[in-house]
Amino acid sequence: MEMKKRLTLELRNKKPGEVKELVLDNCRSDDGKIVGLSSDFENLEFLSMINVNLLSISNLPKLNKLRKLELSDNRISGGLEVLAERTPNLTHLNLSGNKIKDINTLEPLKKLPNLHSLDLFNCEVTMLINYRESVFTLLPQLTYLDGFDADEQEAPDSDPEADGDGLEDEYENGEGEEEEDDDEEDDLDEEVIDEEDDEDDDLEGEEEEDGVDDEEEDEEEDGEDEEDDEADDDLPRGEKRKRNLEDEGEEDPEDEEDDEDD
């Protein structure tokens, strides 16, 4: 697919100014030059043109916000001064698999003060003696060359600055704080529920104790009644009858007869 058609397809009815990332890998460029890309892509931060048969980047438009440029597996041999003029805020540049042969070709990159990472894998320049030392000396602003720093420490898999993860991290941290607040509220709710459950348990325990006390009192009263009945059973028949009448508020007929005799 031609680069111009691919560019139209990638836009997907968006305006160029709305695009922040653009991938044009493996399409065909006309005469080895960039086609269709303009300064209307004013908010573009990431541009990838891998294996598009580029010979020159002279047609690269002014892209002030561009931070990461992927140009690997092309046939670029020079003309890098265009980058300093049109992509002044570039932080990552990948020129792997191009025709870069000597250190002097990289000299224009000195004018990119924010250049943080440079990749030159499979370029002839990497075969030069003291290649790494020479590049770090020429470009002191570099942190990583071909994925490693000057002390041979490997670069992290992703760089928050280049990938635009800084804002995402802040957003995630904000969400994390909200989640922590939610967790604290949940914990407080659980504590309140536990306290209410404990109060309910205490009330139930008190009610059970009251029930036990009432049962014991009833049993004691029943026991007293039974003792009274047993005592009554032990009385002689006449006295028992008399006692029952007294309890009922009546007089014994025999007593009445005695009164009459008197």
Curated annotation (Swiss-Prot):
Taxonomy, superkingdom: Eukaryota
Q: Give start-end ranges for motif Nuclear localization signal.
A: 240-243
Q: Where are the LRR repeats?
A: 16-40, 43-64, 65-87, 89-110
- Report what the Swiss-Prot or TrEMBL entry states about this protein's PTMs: Directly cleaved by caspase-3/CASP3.
Q: Which Gene Ontology CC terms are recorded?
A: collagen-containing extracellular matrix; nucleus; protein-containing complex
Q: How does it assemble?
A: Interacts with histones H3 and H4. Interacts with KLF5; this interaction induces promoter region-specific histone incorporation and inhibition of histone acetylation by ANP32B.
Entry remark concerning the domains of this protein: Histone binding is mediated by the concave surface of the LRR region.
> Which protein are we looking at?
Acidic leucine-rich nuclear phosphoprotein 32 family member B
Gene from which the chain derives: ANP32B
